[in-house]
Amino acid sequence: MSDQTMAGRTVLVTGASDGIGAETALVLAAKGATVHVTGRSADKLRPVAEAVGTEPLIADFSRLDDVRRLADQVAERVETLDLLMNNAGGTFAPSRRTHDGHEPNFQVNHLAPFLLTNLLHPKLSSAGTSLVVNTSSIGNLMGKIVLDDLDYDHRRAIEFPAYGSGKLMNIVFTRGITQRWSDDGVVSVAVHPGPVGSSFGRDSWFVGLLYRSPLKRLVTISVPDGAAPLIALAERGPDPEINGRYFSRFNANGRENKQARDQSIIDGLWERSAALVELT
């Protein structure tokens, strides 16, 4: 019999159609958790949902109305939410705006999970203690948050720096949750899973080219290896000692951009993001 370290816990994993999201969902379900999964591809998500024993939740994070509908569906399904794994994301060519008119790396990597997490705050807080895990990246080091131009309206968006900025925002958002929701029992942590050889860059021609080349084996780790840090954090649960931390795989002191601890950035990103998604 497999260990049941996650028994009794209710989990939502985003970006669970494949890669580390799917792997994390499958392992946590095997460990006894009730796991709900969401992704944008119905065909790819369906077998994952069947394997964990729940109905698939289809949502495209480039459409904020999908995110709002997803939050409503989750709220209907669960009384409480013990663990939210914000794993959806990737690299995107910035030349094409989202359905909502935002730069895609900004919306998919930050704005959509920011909205979802806020909408699910009542379910997280009603659990007594809960954990939010935000999948970030070492790419945060090449990011830069410009509070007056989050959407690249007045500067050129370049794919990898824009992706890095989104991953930096994941860490900053983690710190914002820590400062605002700790009294509600919500613990938040960000994690770089490692350079995983999955489909996260499928919308990027450059990453797609790299991942189709022999170099992939030299520069990436396997999906199970990439999922391992997420699973370890899930099993650790809402430990106050990790609140607000940024892990580089299993290292609790991952290298992070200096903006990640700038209080004006932490407050400003939250306030501007809330305004953009019309949270009151």
How would you describe each model-predicted region?
Residues 152-154, 206-216:
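A short C-terminal helix-loop "cap" of Rossmann-like NAD(P)-dependent dehydrogenase/epimerase domains
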Residues 202, 258-260:
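Short glycine/threonine-rich loop-to-helix capping motif typified by GTGT followed
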Residues 182, 205, 235-238:
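Hydrophobic alpha-helix feature that most strongly marks membrane-spanning transmembrane helices
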Residues 1-199, 277-280:
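Rossmann-fold NAD(P)H-dependent dehydrogenase/reductase core
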Residues 166, 190, 214-254, 263-267, ...:
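C-terminal helical subdomain
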Residues 145-151, 203-207, 247:
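Short, flexible, mixed-charge acidic loops at enzyme active sites
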Residues 270-278:
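C-terminal boundary and immediately downstream tail of ABC-type ATPase nucleotide-binding domains
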Residues 147-149, 232-233, 256-257:
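Short, highly charged low-complexity linear segments
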